[in-house]
Amino acid sequence: MNWHMIISGLIVVVIKVVGMTFFLLYFPQVFGKSNDGFVPTESYGTTSVQNVSQIFGRNDESTMPTRSYGTVCPRNWDFHQGKCFFFSFSESPWKDSMDYCATQGSTLAIVNTPEKLKYLQDIAGIENYFIGLVRQPGEKKWRWINNSVFNGNVTNQDQNFDCVTIGLTKTYDAASCEVSYRWICEMNAK
């Protein structure tokens, strides 16, 4: 048997497998935006951008279909369990972050379930993001911006910080409201 031919054949097969793997991994990222006007949904086939404009009575691209049939989030917002979330790339103090969310018809995120906290922290990664949890200066109780009481634990709360971030440490962390961080806005999906 000619071992040189067998080894050459195996090398060609390995190169083809590696090449096909890279092709399958990166082809959708490079050529994923098609001009056919359809965005795949999670389990209901496709929803056309034209149908989205019919729902809202306008023909712009400021809203895009999400992965849940019949719901729409603004462009650059993420859909999760009936809500739309915006993760900022810029940083601002807490008040400016809250004001930005208000201009978008939303609020800072109210993270009132462990599942929602995990989802937001997974996306936040190593960055810290303001959420809608604060306490009035001099008070001990933390409240969500919808005025509901928070019953969990906040780290660093003894440092006289009155706002909260999530992200890097996977906990609720007290933070100065005057320091600039990224922020998460939340609204109901339409």
From Swiss-Prot:
Domain of life the protein comes from: Eukaryota
Domain C-type lectin: 80-186
Primary localization class, coarse: membrane
Transmembrane region(s): 5-25
Function of the molecule: Functions as a positive regulator of osteoclastogenesis. Cell surface receptor that signals via TYROBP. Regulates inflammatory responses.
GO cellular component, one term: cell surface
Side of membrane Cytoplasmic, spans: 1-4
UniProt keyword terms in alphabetical order: Cell membrane, Disulfide bond, Glycoprotein, Immunity, Innate immunity, Lectin, Membrane, Signal-anchor, Transmembrane, Transmembrane helix
Regions of this protein lying in the Extracellular compartment: 26-190
Membrane topology of this protein: Single-pass type II membrane protein
UniProt GO MF annotations: carbohydrate binding; virus receptor activity
Assembly and interaction partners: Monomer. Homodimer. The majority of CLEC5A is expressed as a monomeric form on macrophages. Interacts with TYROBP/DAP12. The interaction with TYROBP is required for CLEC5 cell surface expression. Interacts with HCST/DAP10. Forms a CLEC5A/TYROBP/HCST trimolecular complex depending almost solely on TYROBP.
Disulfide bonds: 101-185, 163-177
Keyword Lipid metabolism: no
Gene Ontology biological-process entries: innate immune response; myeloid cell differentiation; negative regulation of apoptotic process; negative regulation of myeloid cell apoptotic process; osteoblast development; positive regulation of cytokine production
Additional information: Acts as a key regulator of synovial injury and bone erosion during autoimmune joint inflammation when its activation leads to enhanced recruitment of inflammatory macrophages and neutrophils to the joints.
UniProt cross-references to Gene3D superfamilies, sorted A to Z: Mannose-Binding Protein A, subunit A
Protein name: C-type lectin domain family 5 member A
Induction of its expression: By TNF in bone-marrow derived macrophage colony-stimulating factor-dependent macrophages. Up-regulated during the differentiation of myeloid cell line 32Dcl3 into neutrophils.
KO phenotype (gene knockout): Mutants are viable, are born in the expected Mendelian ratios and have similar numbers of myeloid and lymphoid cell subsets as wild-type animals. Inhibition of autoimmune joint inflammation and preservation of bone density.
Disorder this protein is connected to according to its UniProt record: Involved in the pathogenetic mechanisms of Japanese encephalitis virus (JEV) infection of the brain. JEV infection of young mice results in increased expression of CLEC5A in spleen and brain with consequent activation of proinflammatory cytokine secretion.
Record's comment on post-translational modification: N-glycosylated. Contains sialic acid residues.
SUPFAM superfamilies: C-type lectin-like
Compartments, record wording: Cell membrane
